[in-house]
A protein has these predicted regions:
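Bacterial N-terminal signal peptides
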Residues: 9-18
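Extracellular/lumen-exposed scaffold segments
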Residues: 21-147
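N-terminal secretory signal peptides that target proteins for export/translocation
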Residues: 1-4
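Intrinsic disorder/low-complexity segments enriched in polar/small residues
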Residues: 7-10, 116
Length: 147
């Protein structure tokens, strides 16, 4: 009788332990870990915003915006987003996304002598396995330009 009770208790522990393990969701990264962005000057007025995207995460191309902030006379002439991957998104329908990394090229127009520029970058992304999407994020990055 005692042996049967112990077997039954072990069975219950195994069933509930397995159920908890099977339903455990992966831990989500903080947004700053999932989506890292840096800017650097490539040449004269050409700047690159480089995104490093964690494994199993992606960024929406259409949710990316780049603007100049608090830098008089400096404007963005053009922004070039490379081609991404098309994804059927459960929340937004057919969307272009980036995985792993993406480099966005930015051409500035600035007066002579302008040394510092602040770029404000808006973006949004999701974790692929759970389908959890982060709220839109914004990052302001200052860059010292060389002539």
């Amino acid at each position: 009788m005692m042996h049967t009770r112990q077997l039954f208790q072990c069975f219950i522990v195994m069933v509930f332990g397995w159920a908890t393990f099977a339903h455990a969701e992966p831990k989500l990264l903080e947004p700053e870990q999932a989506f890292q962005v840096k800017v650097r000057q490539r040449h004269n007025d050409n700047v690159t915003a480089h995104f490093t995207i964690a494994d199993n995460y992606y960024l929406y191309r259409d949710r990316m915006r780049i603007a100049v902030k608090d830098t008089p006379g400096v404007v963005i002439q053009s922004v070039h987003f490379p081609a991404g991957i098309m994804k059927q998104d459960p929340n937004f329908g057919r969307m272009e996304i980036y995985k792993n990394a993406v480099a966005v090229n930015i051409v500035l127009k600035r007066p002579a002598g302008t040394q510092k520029v602040t770029l404000v970058i808006d973006y949004q992304g999701c974790e692929e396995k759970t389908g959890v999407c982060y709220p839109p994020m914004q990052k302001a990055l200052m860059l010292t330009l060389k002539d």
